[in-house]
Amino acid sequence: MNIEIRRAHPNDAEVLTAIAHAAKRHWDYPEAWIEQWKIDLTITPEFISEHEVFVALVDQKIVGCCALVLSDSLAEIEHMWMRPEQMGSGIGRALFEHAKRHAEERGARVLELSADPNAEGFYARMGAERIGKIPAGMSGDESRVLPRMSMNLNSQTASVFSKVKDQSSQT
């Protein structure tokens, strides 16, 4: 299987939103919850334009996405979604590794995310550790929490990138 990873384009938004909804439905969440998450699962053209969003393609078909929100030395993963039929195929790993390398190149030293409870094992296999939990914000189930996960990035790569960035700003 040949996996291509590229930056998302704003016109990919509708496909990415459909993948996000399909991924949530895969875990048999009640339809009422899916409806509550409708806004959170929507990936807009504006979001794609304002953030670093990557898509994975197989046979020129988008099968997954991962968004990075970068600030200083922190990278936050948002909207990591795979088509359910592609889960477990290695595409998620390739997409995660691509996003991780990109965050390192941009100078991030820490990668954090709030995981769906069903995806916590995947992120743990990628090297992230649970650092806490946050309320899921579900009306009707206030006890539901999301694992908060973090991983240190290759500080050597981040350090080299920061030095290059610092040198270029001095010229």
What is the role of each PLM region?
Residues 82, 88-101:
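Conserved acetyl-CoA-binding loop-helix of GNAT-fold acetyltransferases
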Residues 4-18:
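A short beta-loop-alpha structural element at the N-terminal edge
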Residues 17-43:
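Conserved GNAT-fold acetyl-CoA-binding loop/helix
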Residues 123, 128:
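Conserved active-site tyrosine of GNAT-family acetyltransferases
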Residues 43-55, 76:
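A short helix-loop-beta-strand connector motif used in the catalytic cores of GNAT acetyltransferases and
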Residues 103-115:
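Conserved GNAT acetyl-CoA-binding A-motif
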Residues 112-114, 129-150:
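Conserved catalytic-core motifs of GNAT/GCN5-like acyltransferases
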Residues 55, 61-69, 76-81:
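Conserved beta-strand in the GNAT
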